[in-house]
Amino acid sequence: AMKVNNYLKLSEPYSGETTVYHYLELLRDVVGFDKLKEKVVNPFKGKKIAAYYGCLLLRPSKALAMDDPENPAIMEDFIKAIGGTPVIYAQRNECCGGYITMEDKAQAAKRSGAVMDSAKDQGADMVITACPLCLYNLRKNSGSDLPVYYFTELLAEALGLKEANNE
């Protein structure tokens, strides 16, 4: 409590002018997907990658203003930048079951299973997400054998920072 109180007594007033970026926004708006593409050493050529947005990444859209919540493109643009082929599928913006997994695993399994089935039906080789809870639900509750990765895992492979598993 003493540490917190000391921070609260800062002499400089906080005016709320700090811009906070999601890592995907940083890659798109600060680094630039074109510049990222130039740095790729292990492209995901021939890989069909389904982006899973879920229900929290883009909402509330007025507060986050990252992308169109109904028809987003930021992760598909990321997939193109790392050399993959984006897969568009019906369930990419739907809820995976979220926190309901704590109370009703069957409902979470139904929701996450629908997401994975939808991606697989469109020919996806893998799914990426930007939400840790979605990652958990899609991996543990969906019952699917389709691999699911956090988008930064593919970024690390594409940039040669992690052993490539994209062949």
Residue ranges, per PLM feature:
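Iron-sulfur cluster-binding electron-transfer modules in prokaryotic oxidoreductases
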Residues: 1-167
